[in-house]
Amino acid sequence: MSSPYILVLYYSRHGATAEMARQIARGVEQGGFEARVRTVPAVSTECEAVAPDIPAEGALYATLEDLKNCAGLALGSPTRFGNMASPLKYFLDGTSSLWLTGSLVGKPAAVFTSTASLHGGQETTQLSMLLPLLHHGMLVLGIPYSEPALLETRGGGTPYGASHFAGADGKRSLDEHELTLCRALGKRLAETAGKLGS
């Protein structure tokens, strides 16, 4: 049996959400857990996976086993009109078997997102990702205002989870506060999973 891990599951089209996933993974490791970073393949207009089984680069694709066996979950997506991107939704829609068995009940979870514009739907996207987690019975974590960067940020960061203003071309790097908030969220998730597992 493998050691406990936090699954950092995301979809990223231009790389901003992928970078957030890496920073959240750093926070998870600071919290004492292994971070297992996974992504999902793009989908076609027919709503089927259209990428090879193993990606040419970047994180491996997530499996239901990755999700079932995690000690906690960080879920990330770029914003698509205030919602999570369809590849992530497609993956989550296929988790009914885990819901039926209660595999995720009582496990901690957090969400993160990136947007092209400052007011591009960060919080509504985070809320859209929280809904399936609540249906699975997961314990939702956000970022408390005791985290100073949440009060100082001029870009991303919400009490619902980490966020990033990536710019219209998706190339704006995470700023100091966004980095801090990603790592803080990952660390909080790992520490909570540790407390729940003890």
Swiss-Prot record:
GO terms for molecular function: electron transfer activity; FMN binding; NAD(P)H dehydrogenase (quinone) activity; NADH:ubiquinone reductase (non-electrogenic) activity; NADPH dehydrogenase (quinone) activity; oxidoreductase activity, acting on NAD(P)H, quinone or similar compound as acceptor. The keyword NADP applies. It catalyses: a quinone + NADH + H(+) = a quinol + NAD(+); a quinone + NADPH + H(+) = a quinol + NADP(+). Keywords: Flavoprotein, FMN, NAD, NADP, Nucleotide-binding, Oxidoreductase. Residues 6-190 form the Flavodoxin-like domain. Its cofactor is FMN. One of its GO terms (biological process) is cellular response to oxidative stress. Its EC number is 1.6.5.2. It holds the Pfam family FMN_red. Binds 1 FMN per monomer. Gene3D superfamilies: 3.40.50.360. PROSITE patterns: FLAVODOXIN, FLAVODOXIN_LIKE. InterPro entries: Flavodoxin/NO_synth, Flavodoxin_CS, Flavoprotein-like_sf, Flavoprotein_WrbA-like, FMN_Rdtase-like_dom. Coiled coil: none annotated. GO terms for cellular component: membrane. Homodimer. Belongs to the WrbA family. PANTHER family: FLAVODOXIN-RELATED PROTEIN WRBA-RELATED (PTHR30546), FLAVOPROTEIN-LIKE PROTEIN YCP4-RELATED (PTHR30546:SF23). This is NAD(P)H dehydrogenase (quinone). It comes from Pseudomonas aeruginosa (strain ATCC 15692 / DSM 22644 / CIP 104116 / JCM 14847 / LMG 12228 / 1C / PRS 101 / PAO1). The lineage of its organism: Bacteria, Pseudomonadati, Pseudomonadota, Gammaproteobacteria, Pseudomonadales.
